[in-house]
């Protein structure tokens, strides 16, 4: 779990304007998009200590979100069933990381699912209806 901090660009963005300045999210990946600074068509919307480009927009056509805003009560354990995933998590965070991660995810699930609803509603109302 990690904190994602929104930048001022959030205020002008049709998908994320309604979000609080900071949200807690689930991130479990080995790769990330980096080094977009030179691309003038990319707008950074949110960042974290771990991943600079947590949320970014390309022009008005596409978004990149490098964390999971959507979870259910079995998400972490479902992923932990994959031996390579569990091993990678424990290599990075230590023995028992899966259980701790699962508890943190469950503790934050209601807020994360509320953020998912906001994102879906904004996408449905503002993106789909505009196009």
Question: In which residue ranges do the predicted regions lie?
Answer:
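Pocket-forming structural segment of enzyme catalytic cores
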Residues: 1-74
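Acyltransferase
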Residues: 71, 76-131
């Amino acid at each position: 779990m990690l904190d994602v901090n929104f930048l001022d660009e959030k205020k002008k963005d049709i998908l994320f304007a309604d979000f609080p300045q900071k949200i807690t999210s689930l991130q479990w990946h080995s790769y990330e998009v980096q080094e977009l600074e030179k691309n003038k068509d990319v707008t950074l919307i949110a960042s974290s200590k771990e991943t600079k480009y947590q949320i970014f927009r390309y022009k008005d056509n596409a978004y990149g979100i490098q964390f999971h805003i959507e979870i259910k009560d079995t998400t972490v354990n479902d992923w932990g069933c994959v031996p390579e995933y569990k091993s990678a998590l424990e290599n990075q965070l230590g023995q028992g990381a899966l259980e701790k991660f699962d508890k943190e995810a469950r503790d934050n699930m209601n807020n994360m699912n509320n953020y998912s609803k906001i994102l879906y509603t904004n996408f449905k109302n503002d993106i789909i209806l505009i196009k």
